[in-house]
Amino acid sequence: MPVSLLRALLVFSLLCLGLSATRAAHAAMEIEVVGGAANKIAIAMVPFQTAAGQPSPPLTQIVADDLARSGQFSMTDVTGAAQPVEPSQVDYAAWRTKGAEAMVIGQVVALGGGRFEVRFRLLDVVKGTQLAGYSYKITAAQWRATGHRIADVVYEKLTGIPGAFSSRIAYVQKQGKRYELRVADADGQNPRTIVRSLEPLISPMFSPDGTRLAYVSFEDKKPVVYVQSLQQGGRRKVAAFKGSNSAPAWSPDGRQLAVVLTRDGASQIYLINVDGSGLTRLMRSGDIDTEPVFSPDGQTLYFTSDRGGSPQIYRVAKSGGDAKRVSFEGSYNVSPTISPDGRYLAYISRDGGRFRVVLQELASGQTRVLTETTRDEAPSFAPNGQAVLYATVQGGRGVLGTVTLDGKTRARLSESGVDAREPAWGP
């Protein structure tokens, strides 16, 4: 049986999560940009001004890190430069000399009672005009969220594509013998634990509206699919049938899950309502079918199967019928995920013993290797489709990373001393 397909039977996931025990750590995740695309937008991030004696919030660094991680921007050196607060104070010619094409200026005003007003302006340095200006009233607990919000505005105004910096990721962290399902900001910061267990937790996936997580838990001494509310905290067993229940995938309308069951012996894909009713088998075969994912329009499912003799990616209509092979390069392709616009698949491909993230354009079938690591798994697209989140292994432990679609900008979300696996990118 191919190793990848054992994931459907959950042995693969147990092996992935069962690395050597590590000590708990609370260090912030670190971002390392290791490459970059051509034609980046040169942007100057002028430090946000604060009143004398007032601590400087981390807004400037949060926005700069977000933009750098996107691969679309280069940071103009602001050392020794004037630090304007209003557009009327900006010497555009001087900033053009420094190579800046755009700049962000702003200030933080203390309102009292633990509240602040954050004002910022996005300026076109080349034309000498203002592109955007906003003011937010926040508490001290909202610095990071506000920084991500500003980065989203900057990204969209300068690229025409919505930003995804205010989105969230989910992942499983192993600390010693404990497993934690966590949700964090898209940069890995502000993690909070959703579920704790002494048994493995795997395969988290956000609902389309971001209010729920589907995942698999072994707490009943068998794999069971749960759906958990991120707002109220309650959860429901959705699939707890005889045998293995695994690989939940949301339909775009949030009403159904595709799940993989072995209730009839073989690993097969079923559709089930989120309340656990309406179980329907998608196909009937003696092959191992697993890792389903819906197309954005909800009419097609992509999945992994060994029906051709080796694990490959296939697609089938939601109404059933014959499956058609999608991946053709290489003898081992697993774990498909589809971009929000339906143009691309990302999946894990094995090449000479290396497991790496590959991007495939569905219309042409052309592929591109996105990563240089060798033990990648669980790719997941950003909500704006401009990057892929994945897990890999470095130094004997699981770490999370992101990579842009051109493969030139890769970032590590590496929290010291823990194993982080099974990532999913949500709204």
UniProtKB/Swiss-Prot annotation:
Compartment(s) of residence: Periplasm
Pfam families: PD40, TolB_N
Keywords attached to this entry: Cell cycle, Cell division, Periplasm, Signal
GO cellular component: periplasmic space
Gene Ontology BP annotations: cell division; protein import
Signal peptide: 1-27
Record-linked InterPro entries: 6-blade_b-propeller_TolB-like, PD40, Tol-Pal_TolB, TolB_N
Domain of life (superkingdom): Bacteria
Family per similarity comment: Belongs to the TolB family.
Known role: Part of the Tol-Pal system, which plays a role in outer membrane invagination during cell division and is important for maintaining outer membrane integrity.
Subunit composition and interactions: The Tol-Pal system is composed of five core proteins: the inner membrane proteins TolA, TolQ and TolR, the periplasmic protein TolB and the outer membrane protein Pal. They form a network linking the inner and outer membranes and the peptidoglycan layer.
Name the record gives this protein: Tol-Pal system protein TolB
